[in-house]
Amino acid sequence: RAVTPRTKTIIPVDIAGFPCDYKSIMALVEEPEIKAMFAATSDVQQQLGRILVLSDSAHSIGAHYEGRRSGSETDIAVFSLHAVKNITTAEGGAICLNMPAPFDNDELYAKMRLTTLNCQTKDAFTKSKAGGWRYDIVGQGMKVNMADVNAAIGLAQIRQYDKLLAERKRVFLAYDKAFRNCSWAVTPPACTADKESSYHIYALRIKDITEEQRDAIIQEISKHEVAVNV
């Protein structure tokens, strides 16, 4: 019922690091009835011929879905590398391209990379080399490229991410053990037959409380220097 001819993109969100049911979502956009309803309004949409699935995987870097890392199940997946995420570059993100044929993902990547640096055909490092002064501006881009220092921070964390992820899992399971038998607690999913979380956030829910009671609980927890958010 939520899909109409105006629907161009579905954006599933991996809340707290637990992957969505991507097999069902991808099957939905391929259903003949849904594809027949799709009304393209651009050449790219016409070429795809169906609704695009772009996963908000900001929380789920390192999660697993059917034995594969998150980011590999949808047309496009976007990770966050913000300061509070499992892997950080202080600020920034990463985009995974899995567009189907006839799209060329390498070509799409090159276009996206070009756009992040004002559509300049050479980056600052390349321009500093002998003969590198000759370059062009080939379009209307943006200045959103990641600085080398930020990228270096991210690369260092990627190299030790398996260790970081194991520690997050340890903490998550400790919370789970503490709350599992509490009748008032709704604990978050972590691992099923086909999914495993990135253990980004322990999203605990408490049954039958008001907003005021929730806020009071958060204030009490904060007194113990434990960060809590809604």
Report residues per predicted region.
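Active-site phosphate-binding strand-loop segment of PLP-dependent enzymes
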Residues: 1-89, 99-102
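Conserved catalytic core of Hanks-type protein kinase domains
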Residues: 2, 96, 178
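PLP-dependent aminotransferase class I/II
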Residues: 9-13, 18-26, 35-37, 64, ...
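A broad detector of short, well-ordered amphipathic alpha-helices
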Residues: 72-75, 91, 155, 166
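Short glycine- and hydrophobic/aromatic-rich loop-to-beta-strand nucleating segment
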Residues: 78-79, 87-88, 93-96, 144, ...
